């Protein structure tokens, strides 16, 4: 599998460890940087990973910053990207199976390297399980990437709220 990986200067060493791990598992890696500890800005590298995945150059992506929050938000701004900030295998698997996430984000100063590798393995092994319901949710989420009058409609999510009221969703 070809995986794009990017980080900011705070977690360069953590990213290098992830790149080395992925290569040791037989994956091809597109290292989108950064490559040193010189101060930089996480949106640059979130965008690079997102563009690599959205264009098809990479199949999936991994982004890392100190907390994971900034770079995961940045990569989610790239059209075609569905990224999840994860700290456990359950969330990573859910993001892939139910939401068809194509990028996962980590807080490199929050989570240990061995756990990060385990979570990445779980994410890569998981497969999207399309259902009519999650297809609709993904379509609705993807529509938010493009400004439209529908988003200003206070009833934008009514079809889903009505199903909730009818008891069609189960936790």
From Swiss-Prot:
Pathway: Carbohydrate metabolism; D-galactose 6-phosphate degradation; D-tagatose 6-phosphate from D-galactose 6-phosphate: step 1/1. One of its GO terms (molecular function) is galactose-6-phosphate isomerase activity. GO terms for biological process: D-allose catabolic process; galactose catabolic process; lactose catabolic process via tagatose-6-phosphate; pentose-phosphate shunt, non-oxidative branch. The keyword Lipoprotein does not apply. Heteromultimeric protein consisting of LacA and LacB. PANTHER family: DNA DAMAGE-REPAIR_TOLERATION PROTEIN DRT102, RIBOSE-5-PHOSPHATE ISOMERASE B. This is Galactose-6-phosphate isomerase subunit LacB 2. The gene is lacB2.
């Amino acid at each position: 599998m070809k995986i794009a990986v990017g980080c900011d200067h705070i977690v360069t060493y953590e990213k290098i460890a992830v790149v080395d791990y992925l290569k040791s598992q037989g994956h091809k890696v597109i290292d989108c940087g950064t490559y040193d500890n010189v101060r930089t800005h996480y949106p640059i590298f979130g965008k690079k990973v997102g563009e690599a995945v959205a264009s098809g150059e990479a199949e999936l992506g991994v982004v890392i910053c100190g907390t994971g929050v900034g770079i995961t938000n940045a990569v989610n701004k790239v059209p075609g990207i569905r990224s999840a900030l994860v700290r456990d295998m359950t969330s990573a698997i859910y993001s892939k199976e139910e939401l068809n996430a194509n990028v996962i984000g980590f807080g490199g100063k929050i989570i240990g390297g061995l756990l990060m590798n385990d979570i990445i393995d779980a994410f890569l092994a998981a497969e999207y399980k399309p259902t009519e319901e999650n297809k609709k949710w993904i379509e609705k989420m993807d529509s938010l990437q493009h400004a439209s009058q529908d988003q200003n409609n206070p009833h934008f999510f009514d079809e889903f709220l009505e199903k909730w009221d009818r008891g069609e969703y189960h936790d």
